[in-house]
Amino acid sequence: MIRVHQLTRAFGRVRALDGVSWTAQPAQVTCLLGPNGAGKTTTVEIAEGLQHADSGTVEVLGADPWRAPAEHRARVGVMLQDGGLPQAVRPLPLLRHLSRFYASPADVGALAGELGIDEFAGTTIRRLSGGQRQRVALAAALVGHPEVLFLDEPTAGLDPHVRRTVWELIARTAGDGATVVVTTHSFEEAERLADHLVIMASGRTVAEGTAAEVAGSGTLETAYFALTDRSEPA
């Protein structure tokens, strides 16, 4: 489980987070939806232990991720927005290397096959397309069978067939009991994946619930623009 409570974070005079709060439950996909600058990535990086909040608290698997030991981090899978992958290696040796850090890793061959990585397995990371790197980064996040999984825009740049495969894999990971958090700009992705939806704007949570609850009597798109437009500073 993840609990985010009243987080604030400023970069100089820019207030990236302004008291944001939300929760994410095991065996569910929680989608964070919001415009650029809403604070989604900053919030997730704090929950991953990559940044420290100015105030507020965050708990991931009952621990503060900023101070968590290596054993805690091994239970958490992270897919960064920029991939964060070493450039000079090929995908399969990288995934096999990562799998050695876990007691019960995923089957690298099966995972690579499902994501179509075997189609470009002989190419170094630096020569892959953006969509291909996305798939390798997702596999790297999944290889340890994480209890918590953070995915920052996991289907950006993917073609429709691969995107559908990734959605199915994410849903199955949550179905196996993981707490999955996905940041996205896509209404389709949020409606397809989210058991729980958080809409962020201007560093705050402006709506939280199921996609149907957030949409109300209209569409999610209509509700989103109504919520985020009125949250923008004048």
Regions found by a protein language model. Give the residues of each.
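Catalytic Walker B motif of ABC-type/P-loop ATPase nucleotide-binding domains
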Residues: 149-153
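ABC ATPase "signature
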Residues: 208-209
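Helix-to-loop junction immediately C-terminal to a conserved catalytic motif
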Residues: 48
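Helical segment within the ABC ATPase nucleotide-binding domain
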Residues: 163-176
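Conserved ABC ATPase "signature" region
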Residues: 96, 100, 105-121
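Conserved ABC transporter NBD signature motif
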Residues: 56-64, 72
